[in-house]
Swiss-Prot record:
Entry keywords, A to Z: Cytoplasm, Phosphoprotein, Repeat, RNA-binding
Record protein name field: Suppressor protein MPT5
Residue span(s) of domain PUM-HD: 188-596
GO biological process: intracellular mRNA localization; negative regulation of translation; negative regulation of translational initiation; positive regulation of nuclear-transcribed mRNA catabolic process, deadenylation-dependent decay; post-transcriptional regulation of gene expression; regulation of G1 to G0 transition
Residue stretches of each Pumilio repeat: 209-247, 248-283, 284-320, 325-362, 363-400, 401-438, 439-474, 503-539
GO cellular component, one term: cytoplasm
Keyword flag Cell inner membrane: no
Function: RNA-binding protein involved in post-transcriptional regulation. Negatively regulates expression of HO by binding to the 3'-UTR of HO mRNA. Predominantly binds to mRNAs encoding chromatin modifiers and spindle pole body components. Recognizes and binds to 5'-TGTAA[CT]A[AT]TA-3' in the 3'-UTR of target mRNAs. Multicopy suppressor of POP2 mutation. Required for high temperature growth.
Further remark: Present with 1240 molecules/cell in log phase SD medium.
Compartments it resides in: Cytoplasm
Top-level taxonomy: Eukaryota, Fungi, Dikarya, Ascomycota, Saccharomycotina
Superkingdom of the organism of origin: Eukaryota
Main location: cytoplasm
Renumbered residue ranges of the record's region Disordered: 85-108, 620-658
Length: 859
């Protein structure tokens, strides 16, 4: 093998002797290789063997391009580096012109020089030798030399000084092209002196008169664009350059706006143009605002133009470009959702007055464009910015369209933010609260169990609390502390909706507390921080304050609210063991404890204790709820066994372990046994023949004045989930406890059979087993919901019985007289709401189930 390394050669004997001694020395000094993870390698770093010695390994082919073994000659050589280089060139020239027949001596010639170690290492600049002789240097000759092994064509990187026939702009463009070509080939321009060439070219262009410059070519060049921007920034030349540039680029202004480099010059020029010049330029481009806005370069220029407009004439020209004469409604919607165009629309929103927003609002309210815009990432942001600055009339116009398409927005990943944004606008409370509740009440439970709509439900509940508590704090403060609050109609609607929402959450507690998203809405309703002023206890002065308005009976509302929220807290506490394996069980428990601390009731007393009832009393209650087909005979036996077990618990200790089924709602085992669902549906069909539907809740007109809104009909729109069978409750002991919160709680005062606000003379006309989530695969056959998605659970009407009440022979208390009230208008069939007909027949919790019920729950 012929070695062409640039090192001096020696005679054969010297080569053999030196090579042998050097190899023995290297083998003796070589340290064994250690693993990089070994302890010794960390304590004593190991020097790897020379690359030349590694070539002796078997089955290893030497890579000539990586052969650095000859570099060791610099360490052992006594000659100067320049002498080595001279010898190398002599040796290489001899080898290149006369082949050496003795390859062995030539291959060992590298190690011969190691006998003469150099005194010093070579400096970097000592290698910068002119191989081809001295080079002529001239101020008009700029030649770039590329390395021979770089693979770059040297001729493509040569740039000479332009002759008199070439314009300066063309010279700059040629340099720019050569510079780009060099960068594409992986060549570093700085290593070849390109910066000097650029400086020289720019100096020559700067020396030319301003009238002789080609502004069009300079504006579309990377360096020429920077050159002109600097000229504009120079105070002495700014006005002259502006006028000359304006005259040349006026016919090509649209092209410059869309140019990758020209758009920067346009943005800079906007700061220096006069009002007349800017108006003329806007006149040339306003018919093309759509094309400019969607362009990645044009959007920057147009935003700068909008940001620097000086008068109404310029604004009107831009608005005219967005009118339907030049830009259609579909194109405006495209701009709102476009990556580049949405910034132009936002610039118009923040720069122009609301009277100029007509083209945006017209596009939003056209047909179903509100869905297209609100459910888009960029459109959602534009719509929120628009709602934050436009007038109340414009907000109302948009909000009506949003409410119209509410089902398509509330559970969308972007659309739900629009609804939440509307809830923050106080001026819309007079109609928005009632409209939202009218459209969402029948689906409130299911919406609470969906990922995005659950955020809207939480926001809605917090809104109700904020309106009512704000009224209370303002009403009980002094005259100097009172501020503007919502009107009486808004407060009335908020009170009615809040009480109804608590009832809906109570009957659907089994579903909400086990759902991965529904538990968040439940926690919001349970959080005592939201309603601490509403608790009707003597120690809470705000709850017993005098009302400033005679039309509002706040005392009655506080009593009703305290009873309902107390009932919900008790039932939630009762269900805590069933969710102990979930991640949010501790948070819900803390909410219950916070309620106990706020009301002064020990946490342990909140736990329900089912009272011992005699067999005769239980027989009487069951007979009231019994139908002619004896469908409740099983419930009678179950309740009898249940009370018998609790009678024994009074004397004996309860079993140390009770099995609870605590799987989240989304993880429940789905059964394929259709007989279970069919039997349950048949039983419900018998109920339908016997019991006529009654009002769920009716708001007392004396306590809450009518708002003139239609009522809801539960028969037409059944609730989403089963209204669990509840025991008959009596509120007398709980009301007595509220009157004396500091006294000792009587035994069984917090029984789940004593909390709910229901008149004991009223009997409920239905009995049914609890809702079983493991049958959700059978309840989705015939029911369609506009809020359904992959994460939702639809509930079949045949499986979910409607809430019905039987009021045969019932005499409602005169203080709680029922009169149908209304909560707002809506397209759905309404459900009559009653503020005092609270939830009954809740199934007993934590009790042993019969074999018939276990077939629903056991996996």
């Amino acid at each position: 093998m012929i070695n062409n390394e640039p090192f001096p050669s020696a005679d054969s004997a010297s080569i053999l002797t030196t090579s042998t001694s050097n190899n023995s020395l290297m083998s003796y000094n070589h340290q064994p290789q250690l693993s990089i993870n070994s302890v010794q390698s960390l304590l004593e770093p190991v020097t790897p063997p020379p690359l030349g010695q590694m070539n002796n390994k078997r089955n290893h082919q030497k890579a000539h391009s990586l052969d650095l073994s000859g570099f060791n000659q610099f360490i052992s050589s006594t000659q100067s580096p320049l002498a080595l280089m001279n010898n190398t060139s002599t040796s290489n020239s001899a080898n290149s012109f006369s082949p050496n027949p003795n390859a062995a001596s030539n291959s060992t010639g590298l190690s011969a020089s190691m006998a003469n170690p150099p005194a010093i290492l070579p400096l970097i600049n000592e290698f910068d030798l002119e191989m081809d002789g001295p080079r002529r240097k001239s101020s008009h000759d700029f030649t770039v030399v590329a390395p021979s092994n770089s693979g770059v064509n040297t001729s493509s990187l040569i740039m000479e000084t332009p002759s008199s026939s070439v314009t300066p702009a063309a010279s700059l463009r040629n340099f720019s092209n050569s510079n780009n070509a060099a960068s594409k080939c992986g060549v570093d321009n700085s290593s070849f002196g390109l910066s000097s060439s650029t400086s020289s070219s720019m100096v020559e262009i700067s020396a030319l008169p301003l009238r002789d410059l080609d502004y069009i070519k300079l504006a579309t060049d990377q360096f020429g664009c920077r050159f002109l921007q600097k000229k504009l920034e120079t105070p002495s030349e700014s006005n002259m350059v502006r006028d000359l540039m304006y005259e040349q680029i006026k016919p090509f202004f649209l092209d410059l706006i869309l140019d990758p480099f020209g758009n920067y010059l346009v943005q800079k020029l906007c700061d220096y143009l006069t009002a007349e010049q800017k108006t003329l330029l806007i006149q040339t481009i306003y018919p093309n605002v759509f094309q400019i806005s969607i362009n990645q370069y044009g959007t920057r220029s147009l935003q700068k133009i909008i940001d620097t407009v000086d008068n109404e004439v310029q604004i009107d020209l831009i608005i005219k470009g967005f009118s339907q004469e030049f830009t259609s409604i579909e194109q405006v919607v495209t701009l709102i959702n476009d990556l580049n165009g949405n910034h132009v629309i936002q610039k118009c929103i923040f720069k122009f007055s609301p009277s100029k927003f007509g083209f945006i609002i017209d596009a939003i309210v056209e047909q179903n464009n509100i869905i297209t815009i609100s459910t888009h990432k960029h459109g959602c942001c534009v719509l929120q910015k628009l709602l934050s600055v436009c007038t109340l009339q414009q907000i109302f116009k948009i909000s009506v369209k949003i409410v119209q398409f509410l089902p398509g927005l509330i559970n969308d990943q972007f659309g739900n933010y629009i609804i939440q944004f509307l809830l923050d606008i106080k001026e819309l409370d007079f109609y928005l609260l009632a409209e939202l509740f009218n459209r969402l009440s029948n689906e409130l439970c299911q919406l609470s169990c969906l990922k995005f709509s659950s955020n809207v439900v939480e926001k809605f509940i917090k809104k109700l609390f904020r309106i009512i508590t704000g009224f209370i704090v303002n009403n009980n403060g002094g005259a100097s502390q009172r501020t503007a609050v919502a009107s009486d109609d808004v407060i009335n609607a908020s009170m009615n909706i809040l009480l109804t929402t608590i009832d809906i959450f109570t009957v659907n507690l089994n579903v909400l507390i086990r759902d991965n998203f529904g538990n968040y809405a439940l926690q919001t309703l349970l959080d005592v921080k939201n309603y601490s002023p509403l608790l009707a206890y003597n120690k809470n002065s705000n709850a017993i304050g005098q009302n400033s308005s005679s039309t509002l009976n706040y005392g009655n509302f506080c009593n009703d609210f305290s009873l309902k929220i107390g009932n919900l807290i008790v039932l939630t506490k009762e269900l805590l063991p069933s969710i102990k394996t979930t991640s949010y069980a501790k948070k819900i428990k803390l909410k219950v404890k916070a309620y106990a601390e706020a009301t002064g009731i020990p946490f342990t007393d909140i736990s329900p204790q089912v009272t011992a009832m005699s067999h005769n009393n239980l027989q009487t209650i069951n007979n009231e709820n019994k139908n002619p087909h004896n469908k409740n005979s099983h419930n009678h036996n179950h309740n009898h066994n249940h009370n018998h077990a609790h009678n024994n618990n009074n004397n004996n200790n309860q079993k140390s372990h009770t099995r609870h089924f605590s799987l989240p709602a989304n993880a429940y085992h789905r059964r394929s046994n259709s007989s279970v669902t069919n039997n349950f549906s048949n039983q419900y069909a018998q109920d339908q023949k016997i019991h006529s539907p009654q009002q769920i809740m009716n708001f007392n007109q004396n306590a809450y004045p009518s708002m003139g809104a239609p009522s809801f009909n539960s028969q037409t729109n059944p609730p989403l989930v089963s209204h669990n069978s509840l025991q008959n409750f009596d509120n007398r002991q709980f009301a007595n406890l509220m009157a004396h919160p500091n006294s000792a709680a009587p035994i069984h005062s917090f029984s789940s059979s004593n909390i709910t606000n229901v008149n004991p003379n009223v009997s409920r006309g239905f009995k049914q087993p609890g809702f079983m989530m493991n049958e959700t695969d059978k309840i989705n056959a015939n029911h369609f919901s506009p809020y359904s998605n992959a994460n939702s659970q639809n509930f079949n009407e045949s499986f979910v019985p409607r809430m019905q009440y039987q009021t045969e022979g019932a005499n409602w208390d005169s203080s709680l007289s029922m009169k149908s009230q209304h909560i707002g208008q809506g397209p759905y069939n309404q459900v009559n709401m009653s503020r005092n007909a609270s939830i009954s027949n809740m199934p007993a919790m934590n009790t042993a189930r019969t074999s018939d019920e276990l077939q629903f729950t056991l996996p």
